[in-house]
Regions:
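Mixed-charge (Asp/Glu-Lys/Arg
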Residues: 1-125, 130-145
Length: 145
């Protein structure tokens, strides 16, 4: 999958913090731009974490719901009823961090967590984000690719 355009809005602040153990932590921020094309692409990217566009018609079959109604009423966390807004915010942040890990740090990040949610207003239990870096012949897995 090509790098989504919104990932270009992520930028290092140029400041670092340190953990209690003295490990440096880079600070990044999202420099949002009012670009309708990038926002539309990002919306598709976000939506596809919950329900792949290629599967939505099959999944909503028999529900009598439009695509939009299916997503809003059955897949996405509720926008207004608690704890939906906090779940929505957390999901958004996790997806953005997964994009950072995959497209900036160059790890492979599985993207099935949100599609498998059984309760739309509940966080999926388990690992939030995991990234894999695969070994290439002749390199140890600790070497950057």
């Amino acid at each position: 999958m090509p790098k989504p355009s919104h990932v270009g809005w992520l930028a290092k602040v140029g400041k670092t913090l340190k953990t209690k153990d003295g490990v440096p932590i880079e600070i990044w921020q999202l420099n949002h731009k009012p670009d309708a094309d990038v926002l539309s692409e990002w919306a598709v990217h976000f939506r596809n974490h919950y329900c792949d566009d290629k599967q939505i018609d099959l999944l909503r079959k028999g529900t009598r719901l439009t695509r939009s109604e299916y997503l809003v009423n059955l897949k996405f966390p509720d926008a207004n009823i608690k704890p939906g807004p906090s779940i929505r915010s957390g999901d958004f942040a996790e997806i953005l961090v997964a994009d950072y890990v995959e497209y900036i740090l160059k790890f492979w990040v599985p993207r099935i967590r949100y599609a498998d949610k059984t309760m739309r207003n509940e966080s999926k239990k388990g690992s939030d984000i995991i990234g894999f870096r695969f070994q290439q012949a002749g390199k140890s897995s600790r070497e950057k690719q």
